[in-house]
UniProtKB/Swiss-Prot annotation:
InterPro entries: Ribosomal_bS18, Ribosomal_bS18_CS, Ribosomal_bS18_sf. GO terms for cellular component: cytosolic small ribosomal subunit. It holds the Pfam family Ribosomal_S18. Binds as a heterodimer with protein bS6 to the central domain of the 16S rRNA, where it helps stabilize the platform of the 30S subunit. The keyword Acyltransferase does not apply. The lineage of its organism: Bacteria, Bacillati, Bacillota, Bacilli, Bacillales. One of its GO terms (molecular function) is small ribosomal subunit rRNA binding. GO terms for biological process: translation. This is Small ribosomal subunit protein bS18. SUPFAM superfamilies: Ribosomal protein S18.
Length: 80
């Protein structure tokens, strides 16, 4: 393809946000942190997108679900 996108470029290795910043506990009340890992539709972003490790992804998922249950985060965001 003459005008197509280039492929084969090196991708940067994703680094876990929590291990890089020394965060050991994810609090469900910290909604500003949790919003970074939720899509604009309100879905939890997967590890391959965010780069978080498996341990912290499990903790993050639990914290987001608790926060939703306590009505700190919405289950689904409104369409605008």
């Amino acid at each position: 393809m003459a005008g197509g996108p280039r492929r084969g470029g090196r991708r940067r290795k994703k680094v876990c946000y929590f291990t890089a910043n020394g965060i050991t506990h994810i609090d469900y009340k910290d909604t500003e942190l949790l919003k970074r890992f939720i899509s604009e539709r309100g879905k939890i972003l997967p590890r391959r997108v965010t780069g978080t490790s498996a341990k912290y992804q499990r903790m993050l998922t639990t914290a987001i679900k608790r926060s939703r249950h306590m009505a700190l985060l919405p289950y689904v965001k409104e369409e605008q």
